[in-house]
């Protein structure tokens, strides 16, 4: 339809024109955003139906090396008032005004919108955030991360946040995008090991994580999980183990969220071991290539949480 065409073309056409016709020395993102306000007014007069994500609120999280996980809200619309709620209610012109990044404390149901002169500019952004024991914590894994997960800063560069990537940023992945999932090419018989230093003895009784199903892209969800604790980061004791079963759809991809609960235990170091979801058949489960007939499925993991 013409409306769909408008949505796909605008304001992309303006961005293409800006990058193609402007000298590199003169390119200015802030100035471009300021001029886009007038462009959208012109498009409205022309009865064009552009994509209006320009007016939406983007939800980012970021942790400095030793700091807590912070929530950052931004809109490309210049000088917009960002109003937000943390209880799942719809934001209004009288909701809390966003003035600076704030610490993520506990699980919140964040909703935010940009306002101008008391009027909501476009849609409400909805993003649950999970302020668990691991939120904002650096971690180590025993595999090289492929898809690195998180984005941060004005250029949204993949993997720019070196402390959290996609595993401890407080945001769970979903079916809509591969961001902020983190991928691991699993070797048969070798589990993924994720380790976090909690810095002090901490009571833990539950671990939650997500994994992705999409065999066409060589992904199967986790087949099992085990939890180990340590006081010194050297000697670990397993305190829980669980086999995982999932009902797969006929086609497409789906995100699964799994949890494992156990008797409260003290941990200074927490290790989560995630097992591969199994094997895939070359040319049957995914497009045929010159590789082996049977391969271990990749693990795509997001937001490992502890409570």
Residue map of PLM features:
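Conserved alpha/beta catalytic core and glycan-binding cleft of carbohydrate-active enzymes
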Residues: 1-41
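Beta-sandwich strand segments
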Residues: 13, 120-122, 282-288
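Hydrophobic, well-ordered secondary-structure elements that form the walls
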Residues: 13, 84, 112, 207, ...
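Short, compositionally stereotyped local motifs that mark structural "simplifiers"
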Residues: 27-193, 212
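Substrate/cofactor-recognition hotspot
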Residues: 129-131, 243, 256
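Aromatic, loop-rich ligand-recognition surfaces of beta-strand-rich domains
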Residues: 174-240, 254-307
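Solvent-exposed serine/threonine-rich low-complexity stretches and specific carbohydrate-binding patches
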Residues: 238-248
């Amino acid at each position: 339809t013409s409306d769909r065409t408008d949505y796909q073309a605008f304001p992309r056409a303006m961005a293409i024109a800006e990058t193609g016709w402007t000298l590199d020395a003169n390119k200015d993102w802030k100035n471009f955003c300021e001029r886009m306000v007038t462009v959208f007014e012109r498009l409205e007069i022309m009865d064009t139906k552009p994509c209006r994500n320009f007016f939406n609120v983007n939800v980012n999280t970021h942790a400095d090396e030793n700091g807590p996980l912070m929530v950052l809200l931004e809109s490309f619309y210049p000088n917009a008032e960002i109003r937000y709620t943390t209880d799942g209610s719809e934001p209004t012109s009288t909701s809390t005004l966003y003035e600076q990044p704030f610490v993520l404390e506990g699980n919140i149901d964040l909703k935010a919108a940009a306002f101008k002169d008391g009027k909501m500019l476009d849609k409400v952004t909805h993003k649950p955030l999970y302020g668990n024991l691991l939120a904002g914590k650096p971690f180590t894994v025993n595999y090289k991360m492929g898809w690195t997960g998180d984005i941060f800063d004005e250029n949204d560069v993949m993997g720019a946040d070196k402390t959290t990537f996609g595993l401890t940023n407080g945001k769970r992945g979903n079916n809509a995008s591969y961001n902020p999932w983190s991928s691991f090419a699993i070797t048969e018989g070798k589990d993924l090991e994720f380790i976090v230093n909690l810095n002090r003895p901490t009571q833990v009784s539950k671990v939650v994580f997500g994994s992705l199903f999409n065999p066409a892209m060589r992904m199967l969800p986790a087949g099992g999980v085990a939890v180990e604790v340590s006081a010194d980061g050297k000697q670990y004791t397993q305190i829980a183990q669980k086999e995982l079963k999932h009902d797969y759809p006929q086609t497409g991809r789906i995100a699964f969220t799994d949890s494992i609960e156990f008797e409260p235990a003290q941990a200074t170091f927490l290790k989560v071991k995630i097992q591969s979801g199994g094997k895939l058949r070359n040319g049957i489960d995914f497009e045929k290539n010159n590789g082996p007939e049977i391969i271990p499925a990749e693990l795509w993991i997001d937001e490992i949480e502890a409570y």
